[in-house]
Regions:
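Charge-biased, low-complexity intrinsically disordered regions
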Residues: 1, 9-22
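Metalloprotease/metallohydrolase-associated module, dominated by Zn2+-dependent proteases
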Residues: 4-13, 51-83, 94-96, 100-108, ...
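Transmembrane helix interruption/hinge and helix-loop junction motifs
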Residues: 17-27, 142-143
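Membrane-embedded multi-pass helical conduit in multi-pass membrane proteins
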Residues: 26-53
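Active-site scaffold of zinc-dependent metalloenzymes
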Residues: 96-126
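Short alpha-helical catalytic segment bearing the HExxH-like zincin motif
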Residues: 124-136
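Catalytic Zn2+-binding segment of zinc metalloproteases
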Residues: 133-152
């Protein structure tokens, strides 16, 4: 164990434990913060020469602990794969993130971001820098509110998409995708940041308008 791994592991545990102790969750907080510190320290992902690196570590260890804990679960799942997710140190080291070229994802051909970790990138650097990194920082800045808002929008959007399909019978999946995914403010933000809006994927009748270059995938 090198010095950085030890320092980030101990610091992460202290920070995670301290922030959740008032909620009676000091031990889980310390475990998540400490494990993230150990994994991230051993992979040297945080850029200590820039304020963003310190902010990333502090947020991952405190306000963003839910996303960080979920990311630890992703790391564990990646280790069960034969290729271990094809970890990309060249895209991770001192860049405040963990990047995998393959691995777990909720949709085929789509990258997936969980906390400070991106999987199934497939070498798409522009997608990483201009879309997935938006999600990494959304998880950090919105903290425990992020999964709540994202999940609530997804659920309500699925209901709205289903209702639209019942009314017009013009493609259930595309309607649900449009309302639950593409209209999700967090996804809309990332697509606009990437310059890929309007996407060609949403149901045209309900798609938001805007300037863009095409679709993400």
């Amino acid at each position: 164990v090198n010095g950085e791994t030890l320092a980030t592991g101990v610091s992460g545990a202290v920070l995670g434990g301290a922030v959740l102790t008032p909620l009676g969750l000091g031990v889980p907080g310390a475990v998540v913060g400490g494990l993230n510190g150990l994994v991230s320290g051993s992979r040297r992902i945080y850029d200590w020469n820039q304020p963003a690196g310190w902010a990333a570590f502090l947020l991952d260890s405190t306000w963003g602990l839910i996303g960080t804990g979920a990311a630890l679960g992703v790391h564990a799942l990646q280790q069960t794969r034969r290729d271990r997710g094809t970890y990309r140190p060249d895209l991770s080291e001192r860049q405040n993130r963990h990047i995998y070229d393959t691995g777990v994802t909720v949709r085929k051909h789509f990258a997936m971001t969980v906390g400070n970790t991106v999987t199934n990138l497939g070498g798409r650097r522009d997608l990483l820098e201009r879309h997935e990194m938006v999600h990494v920082w959304q998880a950090r800045l919105f903290g425990p509110v992020f999964p709540l808002l994202y999940g609530t929008w997804t659920a309500l959007g699925a209901l709205a998409g289903t209702a639209a399909w019942v009314r017009r019978r013009d493609g259930l999946r595309k309607n649900v995708d449009t309302f639950a995914y593409y209209h999700n403010p967090f996804e809309y933000w990332a697509y606009r940041r990437q310059g890929y809006w309007p996407s060609s994927q949403p149901q045209p009748l309900y798609a938001r308008r805007g300037r863009g270059r095409g679709n993400r995938t």
